[in-house]
């Protein structure tokens, strides 16, 4: 779980960097493409390009296309039709998708994993909910697709590593993830990108480099590596832990307003969802 906890803090910090220095200023598709390219350069010399099971290669490329490519395209498109509170609210359903996809791939139904995911959703909703406007169906559907593809990528990668074991460390087989992400990010930039909204100064370029090298390269790898080391219920819950962490960082570093009672209550509910999942695991073993 240590990988997931580290990346939770990393991504929570990254969310604030995007909000402060990139959102509304730098073209979103260019930002996504830059992150993929920089992360790919990190893994280019690390990746074993020969002697890897072709079905594993294809599977990891699919994971990259789903978990990073399609997810981020849908996320940015949703901002065209939703308010920020609505976007934040509708992304809290990711744990449910994680639990359901894991059950689907393993041809079973795990009540406790789904229950823990729903409790985590409740905790995140307590923190994020701030009312929604009337016309939100299109944005809601876009974000459910983003939630689904992000969840599917994690669960699929976990399954691929288990199904195709190798003496190679995971870092030598992960570069294919960014190849798959590039197959989505590059066409998205060519079709929807605005070349007039490129980074304007050293600060924005610096944030993009930081996002590509740390949040994307290290973050995506460690998140997926961490996913292989925990059960589906824990993975589902961890997908919402960034909510209180992100708001806390926003309060402490950027001095933004946060509803501390709601933050504390929602965070406690998310932590309680981990207990629900552990309770379920004890019941299954018994």
Swiss-Prot record:
It is a multi-pass membrane protein. The keyword Iron does not apply. It is found in: Cell inner membrane. GO terms for cellular component: membrane; plasma membrane. It catalyses: biotin(in) = biotin(out). Residues 3-128, 139-277 form the EamA domain. Keywords: Cell inner membrane, Cell membrane, Membrane, Repeat, Transmembrane, Transmembrane helix, Transport. The lineage of its organism: Bacteria, Pseudomonadati, Pseudomonadota, Gammaproteobacteria, Pseudomonadales. It comes from Pseudomonas aeruginosa (strain ATCC 15692 / DSM 22644 / CIP 104116 / JCM 14847 / LMG 12228 / 1C / PRS 101 / PAO1). This is Probable biotin transporter.
